[in-house]
Amino acid sequence: MALILMIYWAFAKSKWFFYILVAILFGGNLHFRTLSIRFSDPKPEYEVTSWNIMSYNVRLFDVYNSSTEARNKSRDSIVNYIQNVDPDVVCFQEFFHQDRPSSFSTRDTLIELMGYKYYHERYSHRIRNRQNFGICMLSKYPIIAKGDVMFENFKTTDNYCIFADIVKGQDTIRFYDIHLQSIKLQQQDYELFGEKNKQAGSKSSTFRLLIDKLRIAYPARAEQAERVVEHMKTSPYPVVICGDFNDTPMSYVYNQFNTSLVDSYRETSTGIGVTYVGRVPAGRIDYIFHSGDLGAYDFGIQKVAFSDHRAVHCKIYKKQL
């Protein structure tokens, strides 16, 4: 929210830009969470069974692109990227799946190409009894239990959390795939920062609308995060949480997970780690967290984006006692 306010007041040439800038600069350790500094990747020195994990908001594989050629190119690029990384478990947000027969295959293509024999999914919208919109987890290894963490009004907000207990060799890990509430910016909101909206009165009106959306989104995300954390405490296995938090490392939502889990990016990487490449800069909002008895290495962020989010991936292993 502070970043959005800064952008607005910078465009408006308001003195409040300098006030909020000072507040950010003096935010202390809270703001240093956005930056990670590691001098080496903490790859284990002993032989381990590692899990290759990916989290990816695919923005419905660009299914609403009016150009069939562009739509297919986006989907194929996403599928090719996943093939190259070759994750054991991939957690999708904003997932689209069309029942067979399909002219725009997604889930079934991934299953056929990469051998994802096991999956768990949750859809809130189903159009013409064939097109499904929601969240999906694909696994190469057996899922022995699965379920959902239900959010308030999930059918109208399109936000979900699913979990699955997955077995690889002698290890069992509970994976959570989450998509938390977004601000739901519309075209008129984006125009607040562009040249199309030049009149002061119009800017003020749009800005008030934006603040109202923030007031709805922040408490909703907080409540959703709290539900996931409470459910996580009941897990009989180590946990990995993947997802689009729609919030930065400075947020209350991030802190809910960071208090008891390890942020894989900060454990392994150096830099800010930008994952959102949409029209309003948001920095790192896609995460892979894990329990303290697990370790992570070889973290990667997708370099060429085929969605408004970059995929994140890393290898997870169980630490020796």
What are these regions (language model features)?
Residues 45-54, 131, 135, 140-145, ...:
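Beta-strand-turn-beta hairpins that frame and shape the catalytic cleft
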Residues 58-61, 97, 126, 141-143, ...:
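Short, solvent-exposed loop/turn segments at secondary-structure junctions
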Residues 34-164:
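Membrane-embedded segments
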Residues 55-73, 96-99, 184-217:
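Acidic/histidine-rich helix-loop elements
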Residues 2-42:
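Transmembrane alpha-helices and immediately adjacent membrane-cytoplasm interface residues
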Residues 150-155, 180-182, 303-305:
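Short, solvent-exposed aromatic-acidic interface loops
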Residues 52-58, 77-103, 164, 175-179, ...:
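Active-site beta-strand/loop signature of hydrolases that rely on acidic residues for catalysis
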Residues 1-8, 18-19, 219-240, 245-321:
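Metal-dependent phosphoester-hydrolase catalytic domains
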